[in-house]
């Protein structure tokens, strides 16, 4: 079961794709009418926007608001994985440590949703062929695996590992 927070273009797309694969979904969105319509369309459970953070599921996928992973909300999480497209999900850097301490696998937002910036950067640099963009996007799952492996091996939160990797990639680490 996947708990999806946000049912706009990103969250709605995630929900439709997962539903097509047979996943059971719990959906929540700020736009209640849109969330209700999508839940009915997909045969998903409708949850309150605040309550979605407490739904027991395999994955919480935040796809709307930033700063939703706070000290209080992390304590209430009932998922082993947090992976979604919302920007700046961690309210503070300390929240990355809190998620790590809870044993929750966290996919840092700027890694999981890097496809957009990859496309823009390659286009800006004049290297934006569809094939090049897709080849770079296909590297994202491997990067996540590297982040999680390093996090596990070093005991360092995935958010910190990802920050270090990003700094190294852009020549600042």
Please provide the spans of the model-predicted regions.
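Conserved N-terminal Rossmann-fold NAD(P)-binding element of oxidoreductases
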Residues: 2-6
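Hydrophobic/small residue at the entry helix of a nucleotide-binding pocket
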Residues: 10
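Rossmann-fold NAD(P)-dependent oxidoreductase module
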Residues: 13, 17-18
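NAD(P)-binding Rossmann-fold cofactor-contacting core
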Residues: 20-42
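Rossmann-like adenosine-cofactor binding region
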Residues: 38-111
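Adenosine-phosphate binding glycine-rich loop
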Residues: 80-173
